[in-house]
A protein has these predicted regions:
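Residue-level signal for inorganic ion chemistry
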Residues: 28, 135, 286, 462
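Catalytic adenosine-cofactor/nucleotide-binding cores of aminoacyl-tRNA synthetases and other
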Residues: 231, 236, 258-394, 467-498
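N-terminal catalytic cores of NTP/NDP-binding nucleotidyl/phosphoryl-transfer enzymes
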Residues: 1-70, 212-233
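A glycine-rich helix N-cap at a beta->alpha junction
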Residues: 75-110
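Charged, often glycine-rich, active-site loop that binds/positions anionic groups
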Residues: 62-78, 131-132, 266-267, 273
Length: 498
């Protein structure tokens, strides 16, 4: 049983799966794990026959915590203000939407279509008013729960509601101290004193209270979350206690997920710039592979993502399990598909990444791919060509990149190597020789073996003639993709001129 189905097997009745983020910076591959995990759980419930909904909560009432390296100096003046009250870095709209909207687009490309809920809208529309009132009325009980479970002591003046200062606009510099009717009296570090209406967009609950309050308001039944929230005494533990003891609401089924690390760079953080934005990964990685990255392993296992050659290995792994289609892999394939279909035909990305360095003609590449027995379309080939080109320029190691040498460029090879190349030319001109990858590979292997040459050294002869390197793409596929007449002319020139 796939880990998704095992997680939701005991769920009954309608389900609301909740995920979310604070849109304070570029929303990246690491953040994608949350929404993809949420979507996997949503699909697990739906496939179980349960009425289900996926919601995505944008915490746009969170304050800007500091001026991040990717922001201009003018944002120093906005530190402490709610993200939805800050101008966008491009000067067009809101700060929170600037980072949220591209992510929503990326999610749709991944086949994820949650109901988007903005925290600020919940406060603006008065939906948080009663849970705020309950929190303030139970201030002492909540303090005891948080201090007992988390093991940390709250400040003496701690108050379970953070008003927005009507003078300076900050939410992290105020202290509420009294609720009269619907109004919370507060003082701000800027010197201003005022009143905040709990039924308006004039403040917010602290995170450890806001999370369980939203469970109740939104009817959440399942929620995946990062390991930082799932530590002993962490925000899930306090949230569960507050939900059950203060709000009388059962805590949702939890599922902790591990981080995604960038190979050699560690965990991704928007604040440090160590990220691959969601939109960027989809510029070189097919959507089903992003989903496969998450669905193939339990959520509790950390993932190390290598955008270089490791990415090609991931592509190869997906291609292999789709081709083999073992019963135990069918659910992974299904959950990896953006739109839930069982897509059996997979185009060899590694092969395309080689071909686009030889040809820039999708029609030519389509013909080559079809010759390998894969049925696909010009549209699909063009899409993968675009992805592969982006990967080559931005992530491929130099060892993978190449360019074809001019037909008349001199390359020095030994007399023994000339004989090897001449033998290959002879084989290629035989009436019964087949100009396809496997036959070419086998022919070269036989020829170099007859001359007592190690395979790596034998292959190096052909790579040096064609691309001036000691290593290159899979040789059989590489040669079969090239024009036979042009290729043999190149080999004959080198044999005769060196």
């Amino acid at each position: 049983m796939h880990w998704v189905d095992a997680t939701v097997k005991n769920q009954q009745g309608p389900q609301i799966v909740s995920t979310g983020i604070s849109p304070s910076g570029p929303i990246h591959l690491g953040n994608l794990r949350e929404i993809i995990t949420g979507d996997l759980l949503f699909r697990g419930c739906r496939d179980k026959g349960l009425e289900s909904e996926l919601i995505y909560l944008a915490d746009d009432m969170d304050p800007l915590r500091k001026k991040y390296p990717f922001l201009s100096d003018e944002y120093e003046a906005h530190v402490g203000k709610p993200l939805r009250h800050i101008p966008s870095p491009d000067g067009n709209g809101l700060y929170s939407d600037y980072f949220l909207n591209p992510f929503i687009k990326s999610a749709s490309e991944l086949g994820i279509f949650p109901r988007i809920i903005k925290a600020g809208d919940l406060y603006r529309d008065g939906k948080m008013g009663e849970v705020i009132r309950i929190a303030i009325q139970n201030r002492d009980k909540i303090r005891t729960l948080i201090e007992t479970i988390s093991g940390r002591e709250l400040e003496k003046e701690w108050f379970p509601y953070n008003p927005i200062c009507s003078s300076c606009g900050r939410i992290n510099s105020t202290t509420g101290y009294e609720l009269n009717g619907d109004l919370v009296s507060y003082k701000c570090e800027c010197g201003h004193e005022g009143k905040s209406n709990i039924f308006k967009e004039e403040g917010k609950l602290p995170w450890r209270i806001e999370w369980p309050a939203k469970w109740k308001v939104l009817g959440v039944t399942i929620e995946p979350f990062g390991k930082d929230h799932g530590t002993v005494g962490g925000s899930y533990d306090t949230g569960k206690a507050i939900a059950e003891n203060i709000y009388g609401y059962p805590a949702p089924l939890p599922l902790m997920f591990e981080r995604i690390l960038l190979k050699g760079k560690g965990a991704m953080h928007s604040s440090t710039g160590n990220v691959i934005p969601a939109s960027e990964i989809l510029s070189f990685c097919p959507p089903e592979i992003v989903r496969f990255l998450m669905s193939r392993v339990p959520s509790t296992r950390h993932i190390e993502f290598d955008p270089g050659m490791g990415f090609l290995s991931l592509m190869d792994e997906y291609q292999r399990i789709v081709k083999d289609h073992k019963p135990e892999d069918s659910r992974i394939i299904e959950l990896s598909s953006p739109f839930g279909s069982d897509e059996r035909e997979v185009i060899d990305y590694r092969h395309i990444a080689t071909l686009v360095q030889i040809y820039d003609d999708p029609t030519k590449i389509l013909k080559i791919i079809k010759s390998t027995g894969v049925e696909t379309s010009l549209e699909d080939i063009s899409k993968i060509m675009t992805l592969a080109k982006h990967w080559i320029v931005n992530y491929a190691p130099e060892t993978f990149k190449f360019s074809i040498l001019p037909k008349t460029q001199v390359v020095k090879i030994t007399d023994e190597e000339k004989i090897v190349v001449s033998d290959f030319i002879h084989w290629a001109q035989l009436p019964d020789s087949q100009w396809e990858a496997t036959s070419i590979h086998n022919a070269i292997h036989i020829i170099i073996k007859e001359h007592g040459i190690e395979p790596a050294n034998g292959f190096r002869i052909f790579y040096s003639i064609l691309i001036g390197k000691e290593r290159g793409p899979r040789l059989g596929f590489f040669l079969s993709a090239m024009d036979k007449k042009t290729l043999l002319e190149r080999f004959k020139f080198v044999v005769s001129s060196s």
